[in-house]
């Protein structure tokens, strides 16, 4: 399996405003049972010291199919829970800004949520997986391209390290 990583960072500040902006709901989770599906063995304080010229490998263990299934299932479930708490349906969402890990994961999540791909902000092809920076970068691009309008209902979706996941619904 090949992983395409990019480099980037971003931050989003939330502040009080007189507009109709609203944070409807936010859901987070962590799966403690699939830890061995994605591991970096022999790293940090447990790392054996070796000469890097010996071709030392950190020992990443990645079960792609398990991670794929779990990411899709987790993001779809969290989206459903956040939308339910917000009192909204998926049809009322104007944009989805997901973590840009893998296009197949995003397509499968959209299909499972019955959400049109044309309403998803995708920039993975330009930057790769920028880890925690992917959502702020995609949001910035959506704002610059005028895809986010006042009162847009946005669903943010994430899945990542530690097999964590999150979904947040906002009125921009």
Regions found by a protein language model. Give the residues of each.
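Claisen-condensing/thiolase-fold acyl-transfer catalytic domains that form or cleave C-C bonds
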Residues: 72, 76, 83, 94-172
